[in-house]
Amino acid sequence: MSSRIIVGSAALAAAITASIMVREQKAKGQRREGNVSAYYNGQEYGSSAPPQLGKLHNIKQGIKEDALSLKDALLGVSQKAREEAPKVTKRVISPEEDAQTRKQLGQKAKDSSSQSIFNWGFSEAERRKAIAIGEFDTAKKRFEEAVDRNEKELLSTVMREKKAALDRASIEYERYGRARDFNELSDKLDQQERNSNPLKRLLKNNTGDANTEEAAARSVQGWGDTAQEFGREELEEAKRNASSEPSEAQKRLDELKKIKEKGWFGYNKGEQSEQQIAERVARGLEGWGETAAQLSKDEMDDLRWNYENSKKQLDKNVSDAMDSLSKAKEDLKQYGSHWWSGWTSKVDNDKQALKDEAQKKYDEALKKYDEAKNKFKEWNDKGDGKFWSSKKD
């Protein structure tokens, strides 16, 4: 619209200028023609120009022409086109052509509108996406800072405790982790036990003999005696450990290694199975530096329980054997008495059979009694551990 106004204004100025020039040209022509014309009785003769209409007519004519020029400039229609318009035959547009034209214009407007909206929507989406990414990054950063700050505040106490526990564990690990071989580790453990409580040392007797049964028997020596006797044995053992021989801890570990490689022996341990014993020893070998104290305590309790129960069983065996022997002795005495004499030969034969049976029972009872008594004696023997050897039989 603004471009039309500018073009119209320029055309108006040109039209006004042309109108002024036309009026001036007409005025000059009239003056020129008036010079050659003749007047008679107030009328002009010999002139081809139209009669003079006067200044008022000229002014009206100029205004009319100026108005037409202004109209042409505003509507964008040239004078020539207006003059030729009546000569042009008006073409009648059919309804089908008009509908097709409208459809094409509508489709074009729709495509233009859709394309414009799409472009605007895509750009706006990109802009909002960029804004959202920036806001998300900012929020995420603030959230992480808040979480980090809260975690530090809430977990500071726990972390200090965990750090202290870790430091303690690291120190403990360093104590054992610096051991370069098995001997050095066993020496450290042995020294640690001697410095703490010698009564907690178990399986630390002389294990030079490869007989595992005798080693087990020696490990329980002293339980039947007083604490003073047990302390004396521990003192003697400590003196042996101080000698130039391999440490008792090393001997114990070597012996347990052999047991693990060759299998555990199957001596009677009450209700405890061979598999449980082997698992306990293997557990001690795999984590010796950590479980030595607990393993020693478990073994001590276990062996003490077995000792007490085995001793009770031996006492009962001796008592039962003695009762059986007394009964067999009474039967033998009864069947060998004098009041059997004077009976028939058949009775004599039966009497002899009963006497032989009583003698046989007596001999068996005496044998069982002697075995029970010997085993009980071996149990209390502190010299060679024959009790455990006899248990194998």
Swiss-Prot record:
The keyword Membrane applies. Residues 230-251 have a biased composition (Basic and acidic residues). GO terms for cellular component: mitochondrial outer membrane; mitochondrion. The chain crosses the membrane at residues 5-22. It is found in: Mitochondrion outer membrane. Keywords: Membrane, Mitochondrion, Mitochondrion outer membrane, Transmembrane, Transmembrane helix. Residues 23-393 are cytoplasmic. Disulfide bonds: none annotated. Residues 194-210 have a biased composition (Polar residues). Residues 1-4 are mitochondrial intermembrane. It comes from the Eukaryota. Residues 86-112, 186-251 are annotated as: Disordered. Present with 6490 molecules/cell in log phase SD medium. Interacts with AIM5, FCJ1 and MOS1. This is Mitochondrial outer membrane protein OM45.
